[in-house]
Amino acid sequence: MSSQENNWQKNLSKSFLGFQKNRRLEEVECIIPDLAGMSRGRSMPIYKFTPDTTFSLPISLFYQTISGEYVDMDIANQWMEKDIVLRPDMETASAVPWADDATLQVINDLELSDGGPLKIAPRNILKNVLSLYKKENLKPIIAPEIEFYLTQPNTD
């Protein structure tokens, strides 16, 4: 790999570079969230990845349930396996601490083959909602809540 090809690696976050230490980066996981929030995507060796490279996946991954089965829908040409384009968002690049090798994980934006956004992609939906808030000069605030229960042991 030429030094030009891996210059982008020097621009990774300090936290990732600290995690990587002196290990050679081996693999990149290009991931997207599906409609249920499950991570989907593909892994590849580092020599096949650059931030400017796009990748394709079949749109049918949006027809899968969380158990991997396919949804029964009446959509014209549902099974034509049209490709969607993954475009890496390098601002999301992070380490995969549970991987055996030094691995980079990058969330991708989803596009159609003509370059337009895939409207059903969760990240694109969120971007659209955020732009609507911005037009109204509003700022959304979230308040995640971790739910848990305190129970006594059942000795039956």
Provide a role label for each language-model segment.
Residues 1-156:
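ATP/Mg2+-dependent ligation/transfer catalytic cores
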